Structures are given as C-alpha cells and as structure tokens.
C-alpha cells in the first residue's frame, strides 16, 4: 500500500538530514546489582521487586527498577520442630521462591544444612497476608517437600505446580501439581537430569534451579547444569521447552547453554600461547611450580593473561610478577609485550600455603580487550517482567571473580527461542540498556492519553469489592471464584481490536474482540498500584491494526507490504521474527523510523544477496549501508537425534552452510572415564586430524546427502576447518567411521552460516540513536540530529513468501 504523506515541520527533515550509520556504541547494565547474595528468588508486586535468598538471613531486598536494591526489610525467622537443636537458622535460608496466590504471599525455600550432627536439606513453606511479612511456616512439625530449589508456577488455568530438585540421578528436576491451598494434587514426576557427554556434564551430574514461565503459548524452564563451584567454572544456564507444565524432558532441551561465563569466548576465539605457542598441543599442569612453554612466532597484537588462583599463588612470567600481593584472582591481566619472548618462556608459581590453588591459566595474543575481573558461574535463575511490563528480565547469581552476587540481564525471544543478553558486566561491549520504566505509574489514569494498543497493569487492594476494568465496550469483572476480600493483580493487553486479560496469572479474557474505535478506560475499585505503557505483543493469528494485511497459522502474511502501525514516539523497541519460505529471494524488513515518504529509516533483509540493508531517506535522497548476515556460531548436537555413534546438529530454519570447524581437543565430559580433579587439561585428548575419522552429511528435505569437503587453515590450532559448496539445510550429521570412536571431540562444533530463512530483526531507538540488531547481533547504529517522534512499520517487496511470525513493540521510558 502507499503510505499517507503528512505535513512536516522543517525541523523534522533537518533531523533526518543528520542520519548516519556508525559503529555500535555501548550502554551497559552495571552488574552485579546486589553484591554478596547468592541463590535467590524475586517477585514483582505492585510496582516493586522483592528478593530473598542466601545471605539475606530472612530479609527481603526491595527495588523499584531491578538495578537499585537500597531497601532491606526483615520478613522471616526459621523456627520449626525439625531444625531445633541444630545449627540451622536464618543463615540456612536458600533459594527463595516468592508467590502471590489466593490473597496470601507464599515463601518457599530450601533449608540447606549439612552438619556434623545431621543433614537437614528440605523445602519449607511459609505465608503472610502482606509482602513485608512476617511470614509464618504453615506447618512446624514437618517439612513441605524434598529436597532443594523450589519454584511455584501458576498456569493460565489457575493450576499450581511445584518444581524442585531431588537427589536421585545426581541432582534431578521434578514437578508436582498442587491445589489452590498449596496441598498436593498428585505425585511428583521426574522432568529430567543432566545429559551425559554434553555441556551439562563437564564435571558432576547436576540439573537444578528450575524456573518456569509461559509465554506465547509455550512453557519455558530455565535450569542449571554442572557443579556450582567457581573452581570448576562450568556452571551454566540452560533452557527446556514444553507444551505442558509437566512435560519437560530431554527432548525439549536447547542443545546449547543460554548463559555461560565470559571466559568461554576468550577460549573459543583466541589461541592460548601456553598450550599452542609452538603450534602443537602442550597441556598445562596446574599443580606444577614451574611451567615452560615455547612460542615460535612474534606477538601480533597484545598479550593478556587469564589467571585464576586463590589462597595466594604469586605468578611470574619470565621473572616478572603479574599479581604481586594478591590473595585471589579470577581476571584478565594485560601483559607488556616485552615480557613475552620468541622461544622458551617460563611461568613460576609461588604458593603461600598448602591451600593455595592455581585454578586456570592461559596467555592470549589479542587485540585490545577489556581487562579485570571475569564473570562466571551464572545460576539459580528467576525470570520476571520488567518495570514497564513488556520486557522479560533474568535475575540470577554469578561470580565476579570469586565473589558471588546478584546480576540481571535482558531476555529476548528469537525465532521462538529464549535468548539471554548476557553474561554482562559494566565492561561488556555493545548496547545493554537498563530496564525500561513504565510511561505512567500511580493509582489512576488521570491525565494519561490512552492509545489503541497498550499494557495496563493494576494491583487492587484487599477488600475492594467492586474490582473491575472497562476497556472500550468491554467490562471485565472479578470472576466469582476469586475472592474480593483479597487483592488481585491484573494484566490487561489491548491491541487495536483484541483484548487479553490475566488476573493473578489466570487467563480470563483470551484475545477477544473489543471496539477498535472506543479508547475509553475505566478502573473500578481501590487501586494500590497502576502502570500504563503503549505497545503490543503479537504472535500466531493474533495480529491486528496492520491495514491490508491478514494472518494465518504462520503469522502475519506480508506479501507486498508498506504499512505503519501505532502512534509516533521518540524512544521504543520493535522486534519482528521474519520467516521466509523462499530464502533465495525477497527484500523485507521494518521501518525503524518513519516521518513521511521522503524522510525515513528502513532496515531490510536482501535474501538473494544475504545482506542487511539500512536505508536513510532524507528529503527524498537515500543513502544505503550494507552488512553481511553471514556468521560463525558454536553449534551443539541435538540430543533427540544424537548418540555416541553419530551427532546431528539442527537449524531452526533453512540455513545456508559452507564450512564446519571441528575441535581438536576433546572436552573431557565422559562422566564414566573422567577424574573429577580440577586439573582437567592433562586428561583431555588432542587429535590433529578430526575430519578424516568422520563422514559428513547434510539434510536435503528428508534425504541425507554426503558432503564432499576439503580442509583449510582455520587460524586457530584448536579448530580444524572443512569447507564445501554451500548447502541449504535444516541439519548436519556427523557419523564416526570407526564404531569404537565415540566422537567426544564433536560434542560441539562451529558452523559457518551464510544466511538463514528466519531472522529476528530488533530496533531499539533511544531518542536520537537507533540500534539495529539481527538475531541479537548489533550490526549498526543510526544517529539522528534531533529527537523527532516517528512511526514504525513493516515492509516487503512482494517477491518472497514472508511472514512476520511475531511482533513486539513498546514505547520506552528510560530510568531517571
């Protein structure tokens, strides 16, 4: 369609005249946000967040924005029959879970006492009519359930479920249905344990810390795997998807961890000169006092030492002490180029005592890098909506060096998959904004100009007998089964002529119709808190307001599209999943900012050329910037199709692949043959030629076809590269030629992806700056001279079969 031209002020054109594409800037969440607190749980209630867990001693920390936790209140004291006479007290409050249900706040946590007298490792349950307590245990004579890490999830039909960890097959995740009074409605059912010979078993058999949400009709469980100790450095977060709350299993797991340590890209992308300095594999013995290594070439960039030690290990490189006086390190240290020699180099380790331990050591030749403490062991997740109600945020513990604290990072959904923008620190490159605040917050909508697409969150006070909300021509009242004596939390999403309402997480109005021309809003009852934010969240067939476009099961059909939606704004986020059923052609994308037909910013995908195109039209004159969409990514085998004989690596959409990188160093994740000492490098097996032991195949429809390849230099001694003619595929298969060769090296590979049929475009505008992301990679930034309101929209040239499978848009108000 042809978009209507509007009269503009000259200032608007001047603003667009200043558009330019530049390198991506940086604005970071400042992790950690709460120091010294480990396994914790978080609840959002009436515009505030409450956090409790390890080292809170029965207290809650309180925040308005997830970043500042300046208030602390005492809410609970451990006092029951089964902990009396032991050392278990408030110091044994672990892994809080805080839920509001039926007019009560429910606090569940693990008592985690491992004493010389006895072990007390159980889950207990306490309640309070108010969030600030005091919480009292429901039963003092017995515990609630076994064993650790509880989480209560309320499904949209009101059914409650308890997720927990039992010590069965290692640490194993179980689920159990509950009644509304928190009594049990059935037996516990095992969900899954850690999968042998995957990233989940780099040391111990651990699956723990479950946290479940439902979003866009799918259930997502985040969990931890591997040992939590930073000495191992293997603790990571994974995700499992399911179609039902008790249907989580190995087949629903993402093959990859969604959050890992920031040491991982260091090792993946850089050569360790201590191990590979002369081009051959020379494992490091961390127990040695003298480590000798050869370097057969000059340093190209700058040397950096990754050093992890505790208990006072003084480390010297060629006689120069790099950590003088330090009792503990887990950091990246810049090294003077002059200290690194061509030929033999010597590292000496002087240990202060018998408990001094060298945990990790590597020397990289890198371009300029951020130095300082490293981030690792992300774990014990809680997932909450952000202050504006649209965003999802992960609250989790992680180590900054050896200190464990609370961190936050943004969650996005990319191609339907849950993705975490982390692990981040203040030094992480790129754009990682703090949580957005609601456009309006208070106890009423007085003075608010309501649009036709928004989120309204209302917390009604207890004993408010007339709780109801009217949206346009629809009035939603409190269901009869919900008590008006209790306060209730409402979530109302209006999208043009579609209305969706949840009360206490229960879906009471499921994408029902509302008069699109009636913007009236009325809130009845005593309001404790209310927030309002423009935006919409669309998926499936639930699209509205896109003039001339229709939706089917694949989403919004774009065809030939040139269409805007919504009011103008100056700060906003727009995320669109674009699915191309004909990935060899088409030009499609989004309007990142539209003033009129002569002044706009458009970001599109050119499928034939596999490029991201950023167009800047100013007074009718267009300049263009192009960025390749090709990328190299770590790729883990899908356990649904893999075993010790063969590995299959799947793609979520048709993907053009032209090379594979194979790790020469086996991971040491065979739990039946591994010594669980920390000094694993000397145990790992190195294979110079991995490819010759494997037959490679690509999936063509439902037929596996053999890949004819050649080997090339990879630029990294730990990776062997094979290249081949590009194939468009949904999967790769690697089969061991020798049945006794179990393919431990290929527990992960790297794949060279030239283009994928599905791409998640995300536009994040903050006033004068527009950040452009494709599949969570920031590829460009557009700068405007002035802060002029603009529309957003969708575009397609009509030459490809393209759907917008989901669209999330909301106006951003930045924290003050």
In which residue ranges do the predicted regions lie?
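Aromatic-lined ligand-binding clefts that engage carbohydrates, nucleic acids, or primary amines
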Residues: 301-315, 347, 469, 492-494, ...
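Short beta-strand-plus-loop segments that form exposed binding edges in beta-rich domains
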Residues: 348-355, 398-399, 735-742, 795-799
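Hydrophobic core segments of beta-strands in well-ordered, beta-rich domains
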Residues: 38-57, 94-115, 137-140, 149-176, ...
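Surface loop/turn signatures of beta-propeller and other carbohydrate-active proteins
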Residues: 26-44, 67-99, 132-154, 181-211, ...
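Beta-strand-rich ligand-recognition modules
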Residues: 285-288, 295-298, 308-366, 483-485, ...
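Edge beta-strands of jelly-roll/beta-sandwich modules across compartments, strongly enriched
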Residues: 354-363, 527-530, 673, 740-753, ...
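Extracellular glycan-recognition regions
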Residues: 27, 268, 280, 368-369, ...
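Aromatic, loop-rich ligand-recognition surfaces of beta-strand-rich domains
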Residues: 631-708, 713-755, 809
């Amino acid at each position: 369609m042809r978009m209507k031209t509007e009269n503009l002020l000259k200032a608007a054109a001047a603003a667009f005249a200043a558009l330019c594409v530049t390198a991506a800037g940086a604005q970071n969440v400042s992790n950690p946000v709460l120091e010294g607190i480990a396994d914790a749980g978080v609840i959002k209630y009436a515009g505030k967040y409450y956090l409790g867990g390890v080292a809170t001693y029965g207290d809650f920390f309180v925040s308005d924005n997830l970043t500042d936790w300046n208030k602390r209140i005492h809410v609970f004291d451990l006092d029951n029959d089964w902990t009396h006479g032991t050392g278990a007290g408030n110091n044994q409050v672990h892994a809080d879970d805080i839920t509001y249900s039926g007019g009560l706040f429910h606090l569940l946590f693990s008592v985690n006492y491992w004493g010389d007298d006895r072990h007390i490792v159980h889950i207990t349950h306490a309640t309070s009519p108010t969030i600030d307590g005091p919480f009292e245990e429901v039963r003092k004579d017995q515990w609630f359930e076994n064993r650790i890490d509880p989480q209560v999830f309320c499904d949209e039909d009101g059914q409650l479920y308890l997720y927990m960890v039992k010590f069965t097959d290692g640490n194993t995740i179980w689920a159990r249905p509950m009644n509304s009074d928190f009594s049990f409605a059935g037996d516990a059912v095992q969900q899954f344990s850690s999968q042998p010979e995957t990233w989940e078993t780099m040391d111990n058999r651990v699956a723990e810390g479950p946290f479940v949400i439902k979003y866009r009709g799918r259930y997502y469980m985040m969990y931890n795997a591997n040992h939590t100790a930073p000495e191992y450095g293997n603790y990571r977060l994974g995700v499992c998807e399911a179609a039902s709350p008790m249907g989580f299993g190995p087949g629903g797991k993402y093959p990859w961890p969604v959050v890992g340590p920031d040491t991982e890209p260091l090792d993946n992308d850089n050569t360790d000169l201590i191990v590979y300095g002369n081009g051959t594999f020379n494992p490091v013995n961390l127990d040695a006092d003298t480590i000798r290594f050869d370097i057969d070439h000059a340093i190209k960039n700058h040397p950096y030492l990754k050093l992890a030690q505790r208990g006072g290990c003084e480390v010297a490189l060629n006689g120069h002490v790099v950590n003088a006086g330090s009792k503990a390190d887990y950091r990246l240290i810049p090294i003077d180029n002059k200290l690194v020699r061509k030929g033999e180099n010597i590292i000496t380790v002087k240990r202060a005592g018998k408990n001094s331990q060298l945990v990790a050591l590597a020397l990289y030749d890198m371009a300029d890098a951020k130095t300082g403490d490293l981030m690792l062991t992300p774990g014990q997740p809680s997932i909450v909506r952000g202050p504006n109600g649209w965003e999802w945020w992960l609250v989790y513990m992680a180590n900054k060096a050896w200190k464990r604290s609370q961190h936050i990072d943004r969650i996005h959904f990319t191609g339907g998959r849950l993705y975490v923008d982390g692990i981040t620190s203040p030094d992480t490159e790129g754009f990682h904004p703090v949580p957005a605040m609601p456009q309006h917050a208070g106890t009423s909508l007085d003075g608010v100009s309501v649009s036709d697409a928004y989120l309204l969150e209302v917390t009604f006070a207890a004993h408010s007998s007339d709780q109801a909300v009217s949206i346009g021509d629809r009035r939603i009242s409190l269901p009869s089964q919900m008590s008006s004596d209790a306060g209730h939390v409402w979530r109302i999403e209006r999208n043009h002529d579609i209305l969706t309402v949840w009360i206490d997480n229960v879906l009471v109005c499921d994408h029902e119709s509302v008069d699109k021309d009636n913007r009236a809003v009325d809130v009845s009852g005593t309001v404790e808190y209310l927030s309002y934010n423009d935006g919409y969240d669309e998926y499936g067939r639930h699209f509205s307001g896109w003039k001339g476009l229709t939706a089917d099961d694949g989403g919004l059909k774009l065809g030939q599209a040139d269409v805007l939606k919504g009011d103008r704004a100056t700060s906003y986020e727009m995320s669109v999943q674009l699915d191309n059923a004909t990935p060899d052609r088409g030009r499609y994308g989004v309007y990142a900012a539209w003033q009129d037909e002569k002044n706009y910013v458009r970001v599109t995908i050119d499928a034939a050329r596999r490029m991201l195109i950023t167009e800047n039209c100013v007074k009718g004159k267009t300049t263009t910037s192009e960025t390749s969409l090709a990328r190299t990514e770590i790729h883990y085998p899908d356990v649904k199709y893999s075993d010790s004989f063969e590995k299959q690596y799947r793609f979520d959409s048709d993907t053009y692949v032209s090379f594979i990188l194979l790790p020469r160093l086996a991971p040491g994740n065979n739990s039946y043959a591994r010594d669980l000492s920390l000094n694993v490098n000397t145990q790992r097996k190195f294979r110079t030629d991995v490819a010759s032991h494997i037959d490679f195949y690509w999936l063509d429809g439902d037929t596996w076809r053999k890949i004819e390849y050649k080997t090339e230099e990879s630029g990294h001694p730990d990776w062997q590269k094979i290249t081949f003619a590009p194939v468009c595929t949904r999967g790769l298969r690697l089969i061991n030629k020798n049945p006794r060769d179990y393919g431990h090296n290929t527990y992960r590979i790297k794949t060279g992806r030239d283009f994928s049929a599905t791409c998640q475009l995300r536009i994040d505008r903050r006033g004068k700056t527009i950040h452009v992301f494709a599949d969570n990679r920031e590829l460009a930034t557009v700068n405007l001279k002035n802060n002029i309101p603009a529309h957003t929209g969708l575009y397609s040239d009509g030459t490809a079969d393209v759907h917008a499978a989901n669209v999330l848009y909301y106006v951003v108000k930045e924290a003050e």
